[in-house]
Swiss-Prot record:
Protein name, as recorded: Putative anthocyanidin reductase
Source species: Ginkgo biloba (Ginkgo)
Active site per UniProt: 176
GO BP annotation list: flavonoid biosynthetic process
The entry's keywords: Flavonoid biosynthesis, NADP, Oxidoreductase
Length: 342
């Protein structure tokens, strides 16, 4: 491959975003358009206006956004979308957390889909870098009972533990871990510049027509949604902590890493690492109008690990939103959706 300069914002720079109709990817498209990029966005059905109108209505979309049909597990499906691009943001991923057939419904599609995107990218000389969105589920899950664990980009989730013990939701972290490992291996074998971004619970406003499940999850202590609260507890039980990042920060980090020539490898991306008891105490004090539970007998009193974003910070990135901003904006967003009233 003989790519040119690293992508930079401007009306002559074209990038592709996969899975563009989703929560994170649609916000990423929004931010890229704001910065002046030309955006090729992949969706499953460009003609389904109910699923893509939020993209077409973004400022700048009329002149600088083009939708492409693509399917993760269809060979060559991303060829047209990445053609002529300078960079690619691979965000698309299967998100069925409780699949009936984990191997065929979630794990294989995640791996094959990622490789299909990368194979398309190797056909295009102008592509300088691919930024792959991974997950903290790829670094934080293990069978250790050790407290105060320090997690950084050198850590990998224990896939053998997950596949043997099968805790609730086990297939998703397995799919993300194996997909990221496959991406990095493919990149090395084919001299493709791939950087991975590792966020966790992404929270904030959305341009999607429906409320993102991660926002509902993060706000379950406020809304009282027992099912979502149970899932939040399960997250801490399996991964060891609750970590949060604002949607705008993670998208800014993706763009930052696309544009940063020296970026390489994996980057954990979130500023807030806590546990449910600590999070509940914060929420009850900051938002006393809501009945936030503060007594928990079924979750650890403190998180067993700390996940570090130091590598990203050392690269020159800075987070704009702390926990107060994350929840202030998420609550206001839920009010606009009529899901919170005070």
């Amino acid at each position: 491959m003989a790519p040119q300069a690293y992508p930079t914002a401007g009306q002559t720079t074209t990038v592709c975003v996969t899975g563009a109709a989703g929560f994170m990817a649609s916000w990423l498209v929004k931010r890229l358009l704001e910065k002046g990029y030309i955006v090729h966005a992949t969706v499953r059905d460009p003609e389904n206006k109910a699923k893509v109108s939020h993209l077409l209505n973004l400022p700048g979309a009329t002149d600088r956004l083009k939708l492409f049909r693509a399917e993760l597990c269809e060979d060559g499906s991303f060829d047209a979308a990445v053609a002529g691009c300078n960079g690619v943001f691979h965000v698309a991923t299967p998100t069925e957390f409780m699949p009936k057939d984990p191997e065929n419904d979630l794990i294989k599609p995640a791996i094959e889909g990622t490789l299909n995107v990368l194979k398309s990218c190797t056909k295009v000389d102008s592509i300088k870098r691919v930024v792959v969105t991974s997950s903290a589920a790829t670094v934080s899950i293990n069978n250790s009972s050790e407290q105060n664990q320090y997690i950084d980009e050198s850590c990998w989730t224990d896939v053998n533990f997950l596949t043997s013990q099968k805790p609730p939701g086990w297939a998703y972290p397995v799919s993300k871990t194996l997909a990221e490992q496959a991406a990095l291996k493919y990149a090395e074998e084919h001299s493709l510049d791939v950087v991975t971004v590792i966020p966790v619970l992404v929270v904030g406003p959305a341009v999607t027509p429906t409320v993102p499940s991660s926002v509902e999850l993060a706000l379950s202590l406020i809304t009282g949604d027992e099912f979502k609260m149970g899932a939040l507890k399960g997250m801490q039980f399996v991964s060891g902590s609750i970590s949060l990042v604002h949607i705008d920060d993670v998208c800014s980090a993706q763009i930052f890493l696309m544009e940063k020539p020296s970026a390489q490898g994996r980057y954990i991306c979130f500023p807030v690492n806590t546990g449910i008891p600590q999070l509940a105490e914060f929420l009850s004090k900051r938002y006393p109008q809501y009945k936030v539970p503060t007594k928990f007998d079924d979750v650890p009193a403190t998180p067993k690990l700390t996940i570090s974003s130091q590598k990203l910070l050392d690269c020159g990135f800075s987070f704009k939103y702390g926990i107060e901003d994350i929840y202030d904006q998420a609550i206001e967003y839920m009010k606009t959706k009529g899901l919170l009233t005070c």
